């Protein structure tokens, strides 16, 4: 070993690092390695003599630490630069050209996902606060230390994926536990990515559709991009589908149906726009747009050398066309509320239903007990034992008109946009133009008072004191009489889709009739008091298997004229509440004929409400809570509302049987109920109608 090499080793000092408290000293300068690793950095053919020293330095005197620093810097620069140039990824920064032609970027490698492309240099955006802090800490170090650290960063930055792994493995192998803990804490934040922004929008929407409303609202607060995705109609339309007019299977939360008035107004707006649309009266710019484009294109073909003036003219014309198109977008575009706002509105109403937050309006005007009512939008119709029908404005509480013509008390009524039909104890039904108060026609067919009626499409059914159900067909003017009950028929319900009718009677039974065969296809037994109401539930209503109670101890069902049989003996009954084929109702129901409503609810003077499955005749649930007979009943997919002799109104969950809320206020028995998505109305023998609105 010559003197020069010996003095160089002495300048470095020992190559062995010391350990303090199990950790390498953080104050040790970061210089180039000693003699043991000298050749690995410089290459096998390089020596110290090949490197020039600073002017004025001599090889004869000993090499101190300060005289060796310029040598190390030159050595580092001489060896780092080729490494950097050799390992720069071509797709990130191609080096020069080949044969005078630019270097072509290779096609994307489909074997790797977007996060693992070893052929590309990482373009991850730098974290500004972190880099500022790093820069300040670096500036506190000596210049030589800064250069050494910068060289290490440069080598790692230019290294390919395989080299980077080796470098990291070597570094972590020399780290102590505190340093490894620091790496773990730092990496935990660095590996977090904005996956919603990185993924295609379709996949992002799919992910967001699995979140609940609270999580979606929090996601919208992350960034502008997340807000745009989380507030998109794709996500909230799915949320509305899951919750509006039905109970969500995941969270058990259900929201009221959209306002029918709003739907009808939207439909009328579309029809009005379609009816008044005239092609000859298009907004300015629509008709001439294509002609302008065609002329500009033709001019450019005829005079390709016309110069900048023609080009500017074409640009001005195109700009004018675009601006005109933007101005005319509103002419064609229909304005819709964002689905998030729709959900927000319905959620507010649903919350008010849950906690009983509502406003109350009382309608007074009848001189005797109110026996029937119905409301739609801002119109309320009530029928009373004073033989009159009153039409009210629900928004102002004003009485609009009174319909007079019946000779006795009015027990039932129903109206739509064009007509109102009423049934009275004077044995007649009357058809009214409720907007003018004119009586259009009177139907006489029962030998007793008419206590129940319902029409759907062109079919009208009426129940009477004479123990019969009469069917009136408005289309072919035909009628038929259904006999089978042994006491008053208090309520009837028509389902025109399946061509069936339900009837409830004082003989404690409920019957299902086939209008094609004019026969009874099912009789439901279970109530021990006179059945006052029967209400089919909407087809959207779903009842879970695990919610079924054992209610068959005192329940039987008769199919047709056969003797009473247990539900398990019925055709098509498999012991489950899954969809039952139409054949369960008899041979008349083939695959092309819709089945009757799957579930019905009934109320009786035995103080109970029952939920039935029509295909099997099973009583799925009995609702207990009223102290006296239940006269009035209304239901939808979310709730059941009942009114009873005990002067109370109760709100029930049809799936659990739980009474969610009780309303009081009437001083007489509650005889009739009307139910909407955001309100309900009750009528009583105290001559009052009380309307509860939850849209506050």
Curated annotation (Swiss-Prot):
High-level lineage: Eukaryota, Fungi, Dikarya, Ascomycota, Pezizomycotina
Family: Belongs to the WD repeat MET30/SCONB/SCON-2 family.
Basic and acidic residues bias spans: 1-12, 302-313
UniProt name for this protein: Probable E3 ubiquitin ligase complex SCF subunit sconB
Pfam family, one: F-box-like
Chain positions covered by the region annotation Disordered: 1-72, 290-314, 554-596
SUPFAM superfamilies: F-box domain, WD40 repeat-like
Function: Component of the SCF(sconB) E3 ubiquitin ligase complex involved in the regulation of sulfur metabolite repression, probably by mediating the inactivation or degradation of the metR transcription factor.
F-box domain span: 193-239
Sorted UniProt keywords: Repeat, Transcription, Transcription regulation, Ubl conjugation pathway, WD repeat
WD repeat segments: 365-402, 405-444, 446-482, 484-525, 579-622, 623-662, 665-696
